[in-house]
From Swiss-Prot:
It comes from Alkaliphilus metalliredigens (strain QYMF). The gene is trpB. Its cofactor is pyridoxal 5'-phosphate. Pathway: Amino-acid biosynthesis; L-tryptophan biosynthesis; L-tryptophan from chorismate: step 5/5. Keywords: Amino-acid biosynthesis, Aromatic amino acid biosynthesis, Lyase, Pyridoxal phosphate, Tryptophan biosynthesis. One of its GO terms (molecular function) is tryptophan synthase activity. This is Tryptophan synthase beta chain. The beta subunit is responsible for the synthesis of L-tryptophan from indole and L-serine. Its EC number is 4.2.1.20. Tetramer of two alpha and two beta chains. It is an enzyme of class 4 (lyase).
Length: 400
């Protein structure tokens, strides 16, 4: 077998490495080390050990009988990534990258976070391995995700509030990149999604593909065949890519990525990058993004802190461009309704990000046949969003 010398830098015309010269050597070294891990049995075994024993994989593929009956149409299965340690899919990637950082002898870990789930996962693994951890987070997201901020600080991470720009994920990412440029010798940057310069989109996908690999095995065991539809929410897009990628060549399986329509795609208050965006460069990659006529990144909005990102992973851009996946958009209001539906019907409180996927499922399922199979990636649990939701749904209680 020929050894992999380097990975493809682009997905069609998307991806690449649009970064300052100071980072090029770091990216080349990162790719070299990552390729080595693919052929390193000890590294792979260590990764499998921690996702199994520490995070609790494999996560269940749960038949949502009540939801199936309510919506009509095909059988609905939920891939329960909410049952991972720390409450979301993010830890799959963090375990892989922090093991890689240790292999590279890096002592300081930095990360960006929107909803706080990637930040919590990074702080958690750094606590376990006794590594210095700095997490950049937009000031607006800090307010929305107070519980996760407290968790990160409890775990020993320094949370840096970013007040520039829209004070959300894009701005936190900008600050993390600045830190990395300044401290590249001893610092490892754990990117939380399938975004950024090569090799990050490929690395994160490879650490997240465990989701789709498990689904394939589990659905064949339960149903004896592959699903007809896969549905997942998309911000940067790592939970969706983790689900989609192992099914890429199974063309009979339809893929649906669900973006945040915010107050509506006809307004300027949304984060529907593929639905409304155009090609450009953001955070070191060529992809679709939300920009004005001058090429400036436009502000984004979503009720969900994990989806309000003005770009999207380049592999998703490629899937859209080639027609392999379908990308749709769901409003704040629709996501809130879906959040309540799943909570009441199945006793599962989803993250607001995942609620966007549920909301699209509510439109898709009734159009499917009774013997169709739909798998939805429940990317995270909703504990972190209770504060936001109680303000929106129960805002008058304090006044009574």
């Amino acid at each position: 077998m020929m050894k992999v010398k380097e990975l493809p830098k682009k997905f069609g015309k998307f991806g690449g490495q649009f970064v300052p010269e100071t980072l090029m050597n770091a990216l080349i070294e990162l790719e070299r080390q990552f390729i080595q891990t693919k052929e390193d049995d000890e590294f792979q075994e260590m990764y499998r050990y921690y996702v199994r024993e520490y995070s609790g994989r494999p996560t269940p593929l749960y038949y949502a009988e009540n939801l199936t009956k309510k919506l009509g149409g095909g059988k609905i299965y939920l891939k329960r990534e909410d049952l991972n340690h720390t409450g979301a899919h993010k830890i799959n990637n963090v375990i892989g990258q922090v093991l890689l950082a240790r292999k590279m002898k890096k002592k300081r870990i930095i990360a960006e976070t929107g909803a706080g789930q990637h930040g919590v996962a990074t702080a958690t693994i750094c606590a376990m391995f006794d590594l210095e951890c700095v997490v950049y987070m937009g000031a607006e997201d800090i307010e929305r995700q107070a519980l996760n901020v407290f968790k990160m600080e409890m775990l020993g991470a320094e949370v840096v509030s970013v007040t520039s720009g829209t004070a959300t994920l894009k701005d936190a990412t900008n600050e993390a990149i600045r830190d990395w440029v300044a401290n590249v010798k001893d610092t490892y940057y754990v990117i939380g999604s399938v975004v950024g310069p090569h090799p990050y989109p490929t690395m994160v996908r490879d650490f997240q593909r465990i989701i789709g690999d498990e689904v394939k095995e589990q659905i064949l065991e339960k149903e004896g065949r592959l699903p007809n539809y896969l549905v997942a929410c998309v911000g940067g897009g790592s939970n969706a890519m983790g689900l989609f990628y192992p099914f890429y060549e199974d063309e009979a399986v339809a893929l649906y990525g669900v973006e945040a329509a915010g107050l509506g795609v006809e307004t300027d208050q949304h984060a529907a990058t593929i639905t409304k965006g155009s090609m450009g460069v953001i955070h070191g990659m060529m992809t679709y993004l939300l920009q004005d006529e001058q090429g400036q990144i436009t502000p984004v909005h979503s009720i969900s802190a994990g989806l309000d990102y003005p770009g999207i992973g380049p592999e998703h851009a490629y899937y859209h461009h080639t027609g392999r996946a379908n990308y749709v958009a769901i409003t704040d209001e629709e996501a809130l309704e879906a959040f309540q539906l799943l909570t009441r019907l199945e006793g599962i409180i989803p993250a607001l990000e995942s609620a966007h996927a549920i909301a699209y499922l509510m439109k898709l399922a009734p159009k499917t046949k009774g013997d169709d199979i739909i798998v939805l990636n429940l990317s995270g649990r909703g504990d972190k969003d209770i504060h936001t939701i109680s303000k929106l749904l129960g805002g008058n209680r304090d006044d009574k």
